[in-house]
Amino acid sequence: MTGLRAAFASTLAATLLMATPVVAQTREAPKYGGSLEIGTVYVTISALSWDSADFNWKHNHDTGQFYEQLFAADLSKARRNGGTQAFVLDAHLPSEAIRGELAESWEWKQNPLRVEIKLRKGIMFPEKAGVMKAREFVAEDVVFSYDRLDKSPKKILGYFDHVEKVEATDRHTVVFTLKHPFAEWDYRFGWGYMSGIMPKEVVDAGAANWRNATGTGPFQLTDFVSGNSNTYTRNPAYWDKEKIGDKEYQIPFVDKVVYRTIKDEATFVTALRTGKLDILEAIRWQNVESLKKSAPQLKWNRWLAQSGTFLAMRVDQDGPFKDVRVRRALNMAVNKAEIVKEYYSGNAELFAYPQHPDYGGYFEPLDKMPASVRELFAYDPARAKKLLAEAGYPKGFSFKVQVCSCNPDHMDLLPLVAAYLEQVGVKLEIQPMEYGAFLSAMTSRTMTAGYFMNNGHTNPTTTIRKSFVTGQTWNPSGWSDPAYDAKMEAAYREPDEAKREAMLRDLTREILDKAPYIWLPTPYVYSAWWPWVKNYGGELRAGAVRPGPIYARIWVDQDLKKKMGF
């Protein structure tokens, strides 16, 4: 079996900054049973779609417990097992950290360029009353799932343009034929956001209805209350095992996993403190010290946020933001170093977007950037006023900014940004929105001139493509430059990893310099869990925002939980 990206020579290793290094744990014999109550990374946001054809970013987070994929993270490489991987990156798996999930083996072949994937035999879709009888997962299920995405009217522009065809050559073999080398072939339909394998019977019954959902995964969705909870129940016929010590164990260990949706920050922090949550995956630094004092038994992991924070300035409509001098001025008007020091109390990096520091050779630190980029991160209100005057706005201007009320950090940070801008004559009209309306404003291109958001880094190529290539859904500024688009396409087709890294560094420098956003610091985030949560070290994703395989390997020490008074 060849390496997953043998054709593309990927050697990137992701390494996360930690508050306390996670070392290989003493392996206890697991115990079955109990439930796992989780406030996930997206604790404030309920499930948005159960249908992969909607191309909704959160779909995989909520369905990855039952819709499995061809590939997933090799969790044996986690730091808690003595490996090198933190598994917190939102949608980036280094080649050496990928395993076959539904795929048993794969091999690259030439003339034509294709990857031949052998599927595991004997994996079953369980019976689902009113939807389907139990049956074996086969290659046609992969072809069906791919074709349905490819034909979806909601498909991301150009998403599968590199694929010539997908075909089942026998019951347990599927072949992807490519038009040319493509750096993201495995991410796009292997372990990506929409890569879950959905049986045709679910589509026939209605894939948008959660009650019809069923897949080959370790858990089945048994209840959903919008804005409150997702409940996943153990699949007793699940095929995979977890090796602990020298012994393999059938998984999952817990009987039930429950996602709790809690919009209020104080409420979900209290839920962790009082043991109502076993794990809380995303905690702002402001809450850490109080939690450590009131619940000293909690275990911790610290990680640099997997999304960039910025104020997008629309360049696709007439107004001040058409002028690069205005965009650069607004960057210089915000004291970003002071935000790191005073607002985040040092718990942030001044520069960590659009590339992430954990992306190895794709990332170029600020001190290596051209002077024209560096000055965007230096506070210079006098220079900002001069640029505004040169652009025809000596007295400034005002504009509206939408922000999601679901994000406590943004609700606190945006008024601070507004105060800086007001010092150079630019006034913001802030419009908080619930998440559904906020997301819809972007996807329908009805947002205001300013749009304050997080956007996931995803991976070293997608972070540029989705944010700055013409017509992409997650391009809030409306950036469009045919020459830039062509350079991005060339990077995707470059099979040499070192050359591709250099191309992406150039693309990153260029877009930073053009300043379609007010670039803001990237905060550190904390995860915490109680010591009765076993076989866990703070891992968050085993694919594209997909935690399902991680939860399947956790077991709960119910005796310890009782001993601790919970």
Segments predicted by a language model, with ranges:
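Aromatic- and charge-enriched surface segment that lines or borders ligand/interaction sites
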Residues: 97, 102-153, 259, 268-271, ...
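Ligand-site clamp/hinge motif
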Residues: 135, 204-210, 238-290, 306, ...
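Extracellular/periplasmic solute-recognition and catalytic clefts
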Residues: 165-166, 222-233, 260-318, 337, ...
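Detector for C-terminal structural segments
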Residues: 40, 44-46, 55-65, 225-230, ...
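Gly/Pro-rich hinge or "lid" segments in bacterial periplasmic/extracellular proteins
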Residues: 74-79, 85-93, 97, 187-258, ...
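Surface-exposed binding/hinge segments that line
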Residues: 31, 107, 111, 116-121, ...
